[in-house]
A protein has these predicted regions:
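Glycine-rich active-site/cofactor-binding loop and its immediate structural neighborhood
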Residues: 293-295
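Conserved catalytic cysteine-centered active-site region
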Residues: 92-99
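Short pre-catalytic strand/loop immediately N-terminal to key active-site residues, enriched for Gly-Thr
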Residues: 104-108, 283-285
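Arg/Gly-rich low-complexity intrinsically disordered repeat tracts
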Residues: 337-344
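C-terminal nucleotide
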Residues: 1-14, 18-20, 26, 34-35, ...
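DPxDG-like acidic metal-binding loop motif
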Residues: 110-134
Length: 344
């Protein structure tokens, strides 16, 4: 049997960090806005006719094997830690090889690890006979990722991976609700440049410091988060109205707010790239994820996307990413045929 799954990464436009529990409980109306992009995370499982478990990450260049009898050792396995903990959680009863690959650059701030998490959960769940309904995938993903990074993890990334599209994610005491946003996606695609700066980042470190300070009662951080909440809600309204002038204004005004929350959200190289984009037709810059490296999304003036991309491509180490909006989220496909089994 062969199982293949894929899920899209995302660009977050507003509300980042407020999706981390328990922070959203302190800000009534907390929400994020993001859209899924066609830089996919993929997982492939091939069953075996022995008891071996083989885990391989193509983009990380890592591979190791164990056995069904030693599956409990995966709980504390440092190699390919996310994959190991997911396999330990699902505890399949047949030998298999699991291979993963991500199209997004490592440390890009596009939710690559969270997206891979969802893709692997979809495939592993199929392997164990659809033990969980899809509505359980996101809570499982958040719990396992928290075990890996050892700090609380935000929830918005899993929703874009599982469902795709453009959405506002609303965080309430009784539930987290995904609201699909019906907007002019064509305009979104022709006005946003996604740039990988060439500098990877660690989102857990940045977000944990902010979370700790918020819980410790830092009033300035509380007020910044109130503004982040308002930005998300205002951006949602502007997108639903297809008011792209207002979208640009909101994104431009939110950048200093994010810098106040985390001064290290940009590096000197990122500041250089942002200034170059703004001088060549970009209206606003949005650092993707927790920042400190990774990707930047630029909202451009009408008919200016190509000029912005050309200017940024001239900078050493920077890579303009080719993306499309991904309307589809997680997909899982099964091929059941004994001829695909890996022999002893």
């Amino acid at each position: 049997m062969i199982i293949e799954s894929s899920a899209p990464t995302r660009v977050d436009l507003a509300g980042g960090t407020i999706d981390i529990p328990p922070l959203f409980l302190f800000h009534e109306g907390a929400a994020t806005v993001n859209f899924a992009v066609s830089l996919m995370a993929r997982c492939r499982i091939e069953t075996r006719n022995d008891d071996k478990i083989v885990l391989e990450s193509i983009d990380r260049g890592e591979k190791f094997e164990t056995s069904l009898a030693n599956i409990s050792d995966l709980k504390d396995e440092p190699r390919l830690e996310l994959l190991s903990k997911l396999v330990y959680f699902f505890k399949p009863e047949t030998g298999f090889k699991m291979t993963t690959e991500s199209e997004a650059p490592a440390g890009a701030g596009l939710a690559g690890s969270s997206t891979l998490n969802i893709a692997c959960i979809g495939a592993l769940n199929k392997l164990v006979g659809n033990r969980y309904v899809p509505e359980r995938f996101i809570p499982i993903a958040a719990a396992v990722e928290c075990q890996v990074i050892k700090v609380p993890t935000g929830y918005q990334d899993y929703y874009s991976a599982q469902y795709g599209g453009v959405a506002a994610i609303h965080f309430r005491p009784d539930a987290i609700e995904r609201e699909p946003l019906t907007i002019d996606t064509g305009t979104l695609q022709i006005r946003i440049v996604v740039l990988y700066t060439g500098e990877p980042r660690n989102s857990g470190t940045n977000n944990w410091e902010i979370t700790k300070n918020h819980i410790d009662g830092d009033r300035e951080i509380f007020n910044i988060f109130e503004g982040i909440r308002d930005t998300s809600l205002n951006l949602r309204e502007a997108l639903l109205k297809n008011n792209w002038t207002e979208v640009g204004e909101i994104l431009r005004e939110s950048y200093p707010q994010r810098k106040r929350l985390s001064p290290n959200i940009t590096t000197p190289q990122m500041d250089l790239l942002i200034n170059k984009a703004l001088n060549n037709g970009a209206i606003a810059a949005k650092v993707c994820g927790a920042g400190g490296g990774g990707c930047i999304a630029f909202f451009c003036e009408e008919n200016s996307k190509q000029a912005v991309e050309k200017a940024l491509a001239e900078e050493a180490g920077a890579e303009v990413l080719d993306w499309k909006l991904s309307e589809e989220g997680l997909t899982v496909n099964e091929i059941s045929d004994s001829k695909f089994q890996i022999p002893d």
